[in-house]
Amino acid sequence: MFLKRTRKNKNIDKKEQQIKLVASFIFLTGAFMYIGRIGYNYYIELRDYKKAQEFLNIGKEEVEEIKVDIDEEEIKEQPKQEEKKTPNYNYIGVLEIPKINIKKGFLNIKDKGNNVNKNLQVIKGSDMPNVKNGNLIIAAHSGNSYISYFKNLHKLSNDDVAYVYFNNIKYTYKVAGKYDAEKNGKVTIHRDNKKNTLTLITCSQTDKTKQIVYILELESEESYE
C-alpha cells in the first residue's frame, strides 16, 4: 500500500513538473514575441528618423471640406512582407513635433507612397507652407501599429509647436485649437484664412466615430541651410 501511494505521488509530481515546464515555455515564448515586436517598432521609428534627418541635411474664418478616410481597423494586421520592405521614399519635406517625438518625412500628393497606410499622408487640397495664407493638411493613424505616427497627437495642447521643413525653410507653427469631427470620410476645417496654417488629423482613440483635428498657425520661418 505504501509503495502504491509513493508511486502515485511520484506520478503527480511528474505531471506538476510537466505542467510547470509547459507554462514556462509559453511564458518565455510570449515574452520573446513581445520584446521582438518592441524591437521592430523601435527599428522602424529609428529608420524614419534617420531618413527625415538625411532630408534635412540635403538640402477671416474659412470653412473647407476635404475627404479624409482613416480606418484604424485596416491596420491591425499588416502583411509580413509589407513590414520587411524598406522603400526609398523621395520626401519633399519633414514634419517635426518635439513634444510627441515625431520627425517624419512627407511626400508629394501624387506620390504612390503618400498613403496613410504607409506614411504621413498629405491630403488633397493642401497648400505647401510657402503658399501665402495656405493650409498644409496632414493625416496619420493613431492606433498601435508601426505606422501610427499620430498615436500621441492627443497629447498636444495650445501653444505647443510643430516644425515643417520645406524648400530649405524651417516653418514654425503653434497649436491654436482643436476639435472633434465626425468620422464619415470628410472633415470640415475651420481656420483663419488670413494666416498660414497646418492642419493635423487623426482618429480619436476613445471614440471610433470621431476624428481629432488640430489647427496650427504659422509663427515664423527661417532658413535652415
Predicted segments, located by residue:
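C-terminal edge-of-domain segments
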Residues: 5
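Solvent-exposed, non-transmembrane regions of membrane-associated and secreted proteins
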Residues: 2, 12-225
